From Swiss-Prot:
<feature type="topological domain" description="Mitochondrial intermembrane">
    <location>
        <begin position="162"/>
        <end position="234"/>
    </location>
</feature>
<comment type="similarity">
    <text>Belongs to the apolipoprotein O/MICOS complex subunit Mic27 family.</text>
</comment>
<keyword id="KW-0496">Mitochondrion</keyword>
<feature type="topological domain" description="Mitochondrial intermembrane">
    <location>
        <begin position="1"/>
        <end position="100"/>
    </location>
</feature>
<feature type="topological domain" description="Mitochondrial matrix">
    <location>
        <begin position="121"/>
        <end position="141"/>
    </location>
</feature>
<dbReference type="GO" id="GO:0005743">
    <property type="term" value="C:mitochondrial inner membrane"/>
</dbReference>
<feature type="transmembrane region" description="Helical">
    <location>
        <begin position="101"/>
        <end position="120"/>
    </location>
</feature>
<keyword id="KW-0812">Transmembrane</keyword>
<feature type="transmembrane region" description="Helical">
    <location>
        <begin position="142"/>
        <end position="161"/>
    </location>
</feature>
<keyword id="KW-0999">Mitochondrion inner membrane</keyword>
<protein>
    <recommendedName>
        <fullName>MICOS complex subunit MIC27</fullName>
    </recommendedName>
</protein>
<comment type="subunit">
    <text>Component of the mitochondrial contact site and cristae organizing system (MICOS) complex.</text>
</comment>
<keyword id="KW-0472">Membrane</keyword>
<keyword id="KW-1133">Transmembrane helix</keyword>
<comment type="function">
    <text>Component of the MICOS complex, a large protein complex of the mitochondrial inner membrane that plays crucial roles in the maintenance of crista junctions, inner membrane architecture, and formation of contact sites to the outer membrane.</text>
</comment>
Amino acid sequence: MVNFYDDVDESKSHGEFPLIPVVLQNSSELSVRTIPTGNEIIESVHLTKWLRKYRNALASQLDRYEKGWQSKIANFRLQVQHVINYSRKNIFNVDSENKHTVVPGSLIALGAFFSGSIAVNRSNWGAKRLIFGHKSSILEKLCTSLPSRILLPWVLAAATFKYWAPQTSQNLVNATENDLLPADFVKSYHNTWKRIYEEGYVAKKCDLKRQIDQTLQKNIRYAREQLYEKLEQA
């Protein structure tokens, strides 16, 4: 049997041996230290350095993640507060609408959006129940077309909210145009709307109204002249 304990007399030691073998105490790869409890422990020098380095790196990485997360939370809170302050100043700045019409108008607009979503769903027009004998009506084709499926729910919601809170809805449109959309895009669609609606629809409507008015005036004048001639002949 190999004695690692440097010629300890077992007959006089009463079963007590050194806790740290001499062979391990003299090794440069190992170190012996006393922990706060009073016990001596053996630890690998290189392993301890590697573990300490890994632990410090992990703690530093976690600290960076925590600081980054806290910074993101702080920035998010600032952004939310900025949005709230901006909305109060530029959109929801009409006290009468804020107190009476904005909330019910928003709920009814939400209902209008869901109603539009139901109206543009093909399955709600009986297409699945009558696959072979179903004949699509003009209204069904109009409601279930691709542009209607994209625009109709939003148009209904916007029109409903505008009816209930006209000034707030206009503020929302102005804020979107001024601060969210590119200026060139806003100018382009304003010109397109002016050309289609004002110079197109409105101009043709006024022209048609003027033509009808002129035609009515001519017909009335002709009828009066005919009546006057008949009365003179009589």
